[in-house]
Each structure stands twice: as C-alpha cells, then as structure tokens.
Amino acid sequence: MYLGTKSRFQEEETVVKLIIGARGSGKTKNLIEQVNAAAAATKGSVICVEYGNTLNFDVTYKARLVDTTAFGIESADALYGFIAGLAASDHDITDIFVDAALKICKYDMAGVESVVSRVRKLSDTYGFNFVMTVSAPIEDCSEEMRSLV
C-alpha cells in the first residue's frame, strides 16, 4: 500500500506542536516568528494557513501564505482535507503552520482535536512539521492536545 513519501529536505523526526492560549496572548506573533525562522532555515516549502488575509506583511515572502476564506474552508473536515491536499501535491513541504484553527473550524473544539489527531499521522507519513494555534483556555483542550503544547 502506498503511504506517500517524506520530504527529501526533512532530515529529522517530524514535530507536531500546538500553541494554545487565550485571545491576545501572543500566539500569532509566536507563530509568525516560527514561520519566518523555518522559511529561512529550510530548503523545502513552508506553508502558512490563516483565516482571512491578516499576515501578509508579517510573514516572509519565502513562505506560502494561504487564506482559508478564499477556498471556502469552514469546518474541521475541510481543513484536514486541505492540509492533506497540500501534503499530497508538494513532496518538498517541510513545515505547515495554521493560525486561528478554532476560528477556521467555526469554534468546534472536537473538530480541531480531530484535525490534530489526523494530521499527526499525516505528518509522520509525509515528513513535515506541523504547528497550529488554538485560541482557547488550555483547560478546554483534551489531554492529547495538551501533550503537544
């Protein structure tokens, strides 16, 4: 059975990480710093998925910035399908970042948890790092999500 190929630029184990916190706690700023650092360090592709068009001037041109509203992504299943499509279409992806995941998933925490669970498997198969911000109190998150902070 074909399970995909890992990025030829990925030299170490993949990382799946969440940045969780209340609104205004600096999650997006942290994500922007990580996107720009990854884009500067990698020879592969870095993708940043966002809700709306707010990060245009903050994210380096070396990273591909994708607005979910332009593609009609309004649910957890749509977000996962989009990420899977990115991974399937570009085998040089080393990092995928998602900002405002809870907003993209229409504030469905169970849906966000489902995306995290499925992307962990996808990340191992295709060999990319994954970082996502979630605007919620950490107490509202599952144990699986807390373990990825």
Predicted regions mapped to residue ranges:
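Short, Lys/Arg-enriched N-terminal segments with co-localized hydrophobic residues
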Residues: M1-T14
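Conserved P-loop
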Residues: E12-A87, C141-E144
